[in-house]
From Swiss-Prot:
GO molecular function, one term: N(6)-L-threonylcarbamoyladenine synthase activity
Catalytic activity: L-threonylcarbamoyladenylate + adenosine(37) in tRNA = N(6)-L-threonylcarbamoyladenosine(37) in tRNA + AMP + H(+)
Protein name stated in the entry: tRNA N6-adenosine threonylcarbamoyltransferase
Binding of substrate, residues: V142, V143, S144, G145, G146, D175, G188, D192, N281
Annotated family: Belongs to the KAE1 / TsaD family.
Annotated organism of origin: Bacillus cereus (strain ATCC 10987 / NRS 248)
Pfam families attached to this UniProt entry: TsaD
InterPro entries: ATPase_NBD, Gcp-like_dom, KAE1/TsaD, Peptidase_M22_CS, TsaD
Membrane spanning residue stretches: none
Top-level EC class as recorded in UniProt: transferase
PANTHER family from the UniProt entry: TRNA N6-ADENOSINE THREONYLCARBAMOYLTRANSFERASE (PTHR11735), TRNA N6-ADENOSINE THREONYLCARBAMOYLTRANSFERASE, MITOCHONDRIAL (PTHR11735:SF6)
Amino acid sequence: MGEYIMEKNTIILGIETSCDETAVAVVKNGTEIIANVVASQIESHKRFGGVVPEIASRHHVEEITVVLEEALKEANITFDDIDAIAVTEGPGLVGALLIGVNAAKAVAFAHDIPLVGVHHIAGHIYANRLVKEVQFPLLSLVVSGGHTELVYMKEHGSFEVIGETRDDAAGEAYDKVARTLSMPYPGGPHIDRLAHEGEPTIDLPRAWLEPDSYDFSFSGLKSAVINTVHNAKQRGIEIAPEDLAASFQESVIDVLVTKASRAADAYNVKQVLLAGGVAANKGLRARLEAEFAQKENVELIIPPLSLCTDNAAMIAAAGTIAYEQGKRATLALNANPGLDIEA
């Protein structure tokens, strides 16, 4: 008997085009990846030192049909097997989002398949459900190029932002510091690698803000790094880039881990989930593991590297919950670059 008598499997097709990855995935029951195809554009944006929205949109137009067909082929299914289509409706670059949203609407209309809109950050959080079943209440530390926030969830589909950045996101600070150190885009992995070769010997600020605040601020730290480099150049002093990278990374991680740990205690959560592109950072992963190893009642979940950066499996995972909760989008669904996760 066993697990095979379960009710019909829920098959969700996920589509993600919020920034510079064109991604389509097929996920079963919100937890099992059947296909996960990602076409990255990093090479196209590298020489500009960041994502160029116009170029990103053009690439999505070129790639979306190919990636969609590849995902269906990899999953060995047809459109008839799909219960719903989940697509990132925001936040992100409006031109990029539009490609995914319109592709999803076209397929939904042509094949009469239900449509679900997904918040990009909800996707990052639900990437963790592809690793392990989530337990509530939980806290998610979301760290990416555009977002740095602590999100409290008391149940599926309920998101309360208890802390967020007041200026730069952590990933943004990484990219800007990398540029100051003449490193290629995206800067995060380069700084992470370099930081492991150096020592955090340079005194850099940590923005703790008010004693009871779970908010973040990285603009002061970013400016301090840039000023340190400029001052050293003016004085003709040599600063070891690996030490600067290590000092910067330690400053960022100190604040992220301390605030996540404090919030986990205050909200009495069962799990802490790491989410977002910067979740791939080895230094951050190691520090979180060390911190939460000391807490007996809190389980830390860290997704594999392939599920940290933008992908569509996470959108399908979040979309499964929305679909099962009866949420549906109409064909009037539009890209919403400023979409609020708490809405």
